[in-house]
Amino acid sequence: MTVSISSYLMVALILFCVGLYGALTKRNAVVVLLSIELMLNAVNINLVAFSKFGLYPSVTGQIFTLFTMTVAAAEVAVGLAILIALYRNKETVNVDEMNQMKR
């Protein structure tokens, strides 16, 4: 039994839509950060799917996915560090209350 490219793309679309919904509607900064990570994972699924089912199947999509995952890990580390610093100053993780970076 083989899985077609449309199945991969449908899973990626659902993941991206859930991530976009969370990023646009939620007010908790941690949830927004996790939603952005969901969107990046949807992109990774697309890269691997197009790499596997392309005209000339290769590992290029998987290499780009590894690079994207590395950048996403750095993004999470920096984002969480900023959130911890903001929480210490403002004592909230609500996005609406974090409109300025000065003390």
UniProtKB/Swiss-Prot annotation:
<dbReference type="GO" id="GO:0050136">
    <property type="term" value="F:NADH:ubiquinone reductase (non-electrogenic) activity"/>
</dbReference>
<dbReference type="GO" id="GO:0048038">
    <property type="term" value="F:quinone binding"/>
</dbReference>
<protein>
    <recommendedName>
        <fullName>NADH-quinone oxidoreductase subunit K</fullName>
        <ecNumber>7.1.1.-</ecNumber>
    </recommendedName>
</protein>
<feature type="transmembrane region" description="Helical">
    <location>
        <begin position="30"/>
        <end position="50"/>
    </location>
</feature>
<keyword id="KW-1133">Transmembrane helix</keyword>
<keyword id="KW-1278">Translocase</keyword>
<comment type="subunit">
    <text>NDH-1 is composed of 14 different subunits. Subunits NuoA, H, J, K, L, M, N constitute the membrane sector of the complex.</text>
</comment>
<comment type="function">
    <text>NDH-1 shuttles electrons from NADH, via FMN and iron-sulfur (Fe-S) centers, to quinones in the respiratory chain. The immediate electron acceptor for the enzyme in this species is believed to be a menaquinone. Couples the redox reaction to proton translocation (for every two electrons transferred, four hydrogen ions are translocated across the cytoplasmic membrane), and thus conserves the redox energy in a proton gradient.</text>
</comment>
<dbReference type="GO" id="GO:0042773">
    <property type="term" value="P:ATP synthesis coupled electron transport"/>
</dbReference>
<keyword id="KW-0874">Quinone</keyword>
<keyword id="KW-0812">Transmembrane</keyword>
<dbReference type="GO" id="GO:0005886">
    <property type="term" value="C:plasma membrane"/>
</dbReference>
<keyword id="KW-1003">Cell membrane</keyword>
<comment type="similarity">
    <text>Belongs to the complex I subunit 4L family.</text>
</comment>
<dbReference type="GO" id="GO:0030964">
    <property type="term" value="C:NADH dehydrogenase complex"/>
</dbReference>
<dbReference type="InterPro" id="IPR001133">
    <property type="entry name" value="NADH_UbQ_OxRdtase_chain4L/K"/>
</dbReference>
<dbReference type="Pfam" id="PF00420">
    <property type="entry name" value="Oxidored_q2"/>
</dbReference>
<keyword id="KW-0472">Membrane</keyword>
<feature type="transmembrane region" description="Helical">
    <location>
        <begin position="66"/>
        <end position="86"/>
    </location>
</feature>
<keyword id="KW-0813">Transport</keyword>
<feature type="transmembrane region" description="Helical">
    <location>
        <begin position="5"/>
        <end position="25"/>
    </location>
</feature>
<dbReference type="InterPro" id="IPR039428">
    <property type="entry name" value="NUOK/Mnh_C1-like"/>
</dbReference>
<keyword id="KW-0520">NAD</keyword>
